Amino acid sequence: MWSRLAGTVASLTMAFGTSGCALFERTLEPGAILNDCKGCPELVVVPPGSFDMGAPGGEEGRPEGPVRRIDIRAPFAVGRFEITNAQFENFVDATGYAPAAACGVWGAGSWQYPEDANWRDPGYQRPPMPDEPVACVSWLDAQAYARWLADRTGLAYRLLTEAEWEYAAKAGTRTAFFWGDDPDQGCLYANMFDLSGAAKWGFDWEPVDCDDGFAEASPVGALQPNAYGLHDILGNVWEWTEDCYIAPYLDSLVDGSAVQSDGACDRRSVRGGSWITRASRHRTTFRGRDPEDTVFSFFGFRVARDLTAEERQRFSGSKSQQ
């Protein structure tokens, strides 16, 4: 009997692998990587949890408070990387979508808005690479891409809410940046305005005292991720979020959902800083805000999606407490 059983187990192992996924549902762990279709962005499973959102201070006119406890009640999936030029090109080619133009680019010592500056030519003074994050895209462009992914896959693709973004960026930390409090230690993790950027662009603000070797956008994943496995969540390009920007924060909204406006929303929240951005604006609590049709050479995005009911059932991680 036992020899027959052993032979059966061996046959099953050869047929299905050691996971036995044909017989048992594989659990879905935090950090698991999902990919829903050819050309779709890789997603990382982020666990539910609670965290303190915001900071008691902030730059003048950019309040980051009041600090309040946010409860992310369900696991969700976040883009492992920012959306790349190649991925955005697939969307444009498939749909005929016309993204925003007249992108803000730096030239002749000031910001210029030429009609031919767009995501295909974001003003780097060199061609953008396919594996670099798409830039010169508006909030409206980011929404259009997410809707296309949702239609293509039948899954709930979207932008991150501002609360989800901060939770995912912190990845269990309480320091100013997910690597610590010293921005000069950040060149392993975030493409900020550094010594390479200062040498090429000569902006007035002080660079971080380190060098990642990139004077503008870097290939996604070139630098190290945070503890949740997310690359470039700080730096590279600013990331549009779903929220209508409201300051100070609403005390009543503590479940991680997006702030929505009853009428027209004049500004959307952007997060994370960029290759051109001074160090302080890469803090995980820092809030940017811009009109939803804004396009600059340092604005991009990453996507998120809700897990399906079946994926939530398979999720086996514990709740994170930050």
Residue ranges of model-derived segments:
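A short glycine-rich, aromatic-capped structural motif
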Residues: N35-Q112, D116, P130-D141, G235, ...
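Short, structured beta-strand segments at or near domain termini in extracellular proteins/domains
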Residues: S297-E311
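C-terminal motif of bacterial Sec signal peptides marking the signal peptidase cleavage site
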Residues: S19-G20
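Short aromatic-glycine motifs in intrinsically disordered, low-complexity regions
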Residues: P30-P41, F203-C210
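Bacterial N-terminal signal peptides that target proteins for export
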Residues: M1-V9
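Bacterial lipoprotein signal-peptidase II cleavage site
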Residues: L23-T27
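Functional-site microenvironments in short loops/helix caps that host divalent-cation chemistry
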Residues: D52, P56-G58, A98-G288, V295, ...
